[in-house]
């Protein structure tokens, strides 16, 4: 599993000029882990639950804040990497790779799963012309925040304790991971 949510912060140049804003202030829990990589952690834990161990390797700015970093999440049968950056930009993409193929999800870690592809294994391609085996399996999505608001509203109106507990437990799990990694 590879998640990447790298978004060049509009405040990063000011930070490089030593003008500190909340987004890069350790006293306000600024930084890449808390502000950006948290979305990757939610994505991975939402699919696979709590990892057996986690590690954070970060690029540190002049005031000790993490401007970018990679969380390594260890599961019994695989490793997940979560890249979060405020000092550079990259397409927001998640790769779920296995011996049966790869799911490529554009925008997943930011909450927008606008394009989903399945890429079948290519076998041994050395010396052979590459063949594009991607198949688009996306579904149309309305505004990406709409489903969250609808879920919250349904949980409250229907007093859905099971869904409430599921979301609460996932959030608590992510908070515990953030505290361990900070």
Regions found by a protein language model. Name each.
Residues 36, 40-113, 119, 142, ...:
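Contiguous beta-strand/loop segments that form the cofactor/metal-binding neighborhood of enzyme cores
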Residues 129-137, 141, 148-151:
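Interdomain hinge/lid region at the active-site interface
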Residues 27-34, 134-143:
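A short glycine-threonine-serine/GTX helix/turn-capping micro-motif
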Residues 125-127:
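Extended amphipathic ligand-handling, pore-lining, and cofactor/metal-binding catalytic surfaces
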Residues 10-14, 63-68, 93, 174-177:
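Short, solvent-exposed polar/charged micro-motifs at secondary-structure junctions
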Residues 136-137, 150-182:
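C-terminal helix-rich "cap/oligomerization" subdomain common to oxidoreductases
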Residues 1-55:
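Predominantly a Rossmann-like dinucleotide-binding segment in NAD(P)-dependent oxidoreductases
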Residues 4-9, 86, 109, 122:
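Short, flexible active-site-adjacent loop segments at beta-strand->alpha-helix junctions, enriched
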């Amino acid at each position: 599993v590879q998640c990447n949510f790298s978004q060049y912060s509009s405040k990063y140049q000011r930070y490089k000029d030593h003008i500190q804003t909340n987004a890069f202030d350790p006293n306000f829990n600024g930084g890449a882990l808390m502000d950006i990589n948290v979305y990757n952690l939610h994505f991975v834990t939402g699919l696979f639950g709590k990892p057996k161990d986690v590690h954070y390797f970060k690029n540190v700015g002049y005031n000790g804040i993490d401007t970018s970093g990679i969380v390594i999440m260890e599961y019994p049968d695989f490793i997940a990497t979560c890249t979060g950056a405020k000092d550079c930009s990259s397409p927001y993409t998640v790769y779920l790779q296995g011996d049966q193929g790869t799911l490529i999800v554009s925008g997943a870690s930011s909450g927008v799963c606008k394009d989903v592809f399945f890429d079948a294994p290519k076998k041994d391609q050395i010396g052979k012309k590459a063949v594009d085996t991607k198949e688009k399996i996306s579904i149309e999505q309305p505004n990406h925040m709409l489903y969250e608001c609808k879920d919250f509203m349904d949980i409250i109106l229907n007093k859905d304790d099971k869904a409430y507990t599921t979301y609460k437990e996932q959030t608590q799990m992510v908070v515990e991971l953030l505290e361990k990694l900070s």
